[in-house]
Amino acid sequence: MHRTTRIKITELNPHLMCALCGGYFIDATTIVECLHSFCKTCIVRYLETNKYCPMCDVQVHKTRPLLSIRSDKTLQDIVYKLVPGLFKDEMKRRRDFYAAYPLTEVPNGSNEDRGEVLEQEKGALSDDEIVSLSIEFYEGARDRDEKKGPLENGDGDKEKTGVRFLRCPAAMTVMHLAKFLRNKMDVPSKYKVEVLYEDEPLKEYYTLMDIAYIYPWRRNGPLPLKYRVQPACKRLTLATVPTPSEGTNTSGASECESVSDKAPSPATLPATSSSLPSPATPSHGSPSSHGPPATHPTSPTPPSTASGATTAANGGSLNCLQTPSSTSRGRKMTVNGAPVPPLT
């Protein structure tokens, strides 16, 4: 599963702090020539006596340097959201200042300049703030289309919506909310509880503060969330193939080699007198003991053929037999005294 890496706010401080005062940006203002940002009061006071950027020495407007700076609302919103309590403390300082100096005129007369903007209106949240949310079962687009008919006819008031309302800290994660729903509804472990915002599934590591910042929720009502229950996906386990050990033949030996390994070697076979009659000694029931020799004598099977017969009896193949040696080819053999031509 993909996991995010959380970083500390101190690692982002070089991008969120003013180089002139050493504090976090307040009314962040950017120089258009080099895009370096500073606090508004800091850069205005600096450009009264200097015509260069404090960080890179890029020259700004020679005669009217204030024309080269712009207010950066996006950067200021990022600073307020990343630094806990910064917006709340800044609004309190402004209210205290104008309370101590009531005759001071506020430029442009904005509520934020007077410190009269609340955190709820700005959209900033703190970790310990309580967030109101609504949770209901996710029906899907098809079910919503099917229920449009009864709602248009006025029968939707009779149907219970099943919406539940909760008050949770802003630092609570989606994983904790899913565990709460699982325990509340006694969902078996083989099913997965998934939390959604509209039709988009939420990451388990998202906090309610992250959802409020990522999605267009303006805090004009409870945070609308949905949930659904799905079967948990099982991970596929691949069959492990045994690793061939050293000295083991894994190259796919041929059938001839496998048969020859199982069959006994011709050199180790005993004498074939038990299975074949000896050329010099007639066997019981042979033609020489009871009658004249056969008209068409048959030559005895050589040792290699005998071993082949034994191999065939054991389920082997005759095509894998070794060729008789040269000594067996030149040997003269007789059957019952009759010469037999040498084998070729």
Swiss-Prot record:
GO molecular-function terms, A-Z: DNA binding; promoter-specific chromatin binding; zinc ion binding
First and last residues of each zinc finger (RING-type): 18-57
Location within or outside the cell: Nucleus
Biased composition range(s): Polar residues: 240-253, 314-328
SUPFAM superfamilies on file: RING/U-box
Skewed-composition ranges (Low complexity): 263-313
Phosphothreonine modified-residue sites: T344
PROSITE patterns associated with the record: ZF_RING_1, ZF_RING_2
InterPro entries: RAWUL, Znf_RING, Znf_RING/FYVE/PHD, Znf_RING_CS
Presence of the UniProt keyword Transferase in the record: no
Post-translational modification: Phosphorylated. Homodimer formation is regulated by phosphorylation with only unphosphorylated proteins forming homodimers.
GO biological process terms on file: anterior/posterior pattern specification; apoptotic signaling pathway; cellular response to hydrogen peroxide; chromatin remodeling; embryonic skeletal system morphogenesis; in utero embryonic development; negative regulation of apoptotic signaling pathway; negative regulation of transcription by RNA polymerase II
Pfam family, one: RAWUL
Keywords: Disease variant, DNA-binding, Intellectual disability, Isopeptide bond, Metal-binding, Nucleus, Phosphoprotein, Repressor, Transcription, Transcription regulation, Ubl conjugation, Zinc, Zinc-finger
Disease the record associates with this protein: Turnpenny-Fry syndrome: A syndrome characterized by facial dysmorphism, intellectual disability, feeding problems, impaired growth, and a range of brain, cardiovascular, and skeletal abnormalities. Craniofacial features include frontal bossing, sparse hair, malar hypoplasia, small palpebral fissures and oral stoma, and dysplastic ears.
Name of this protein: Polycomb group RING finger protein 2
Organism: Homo sapiens (Human)
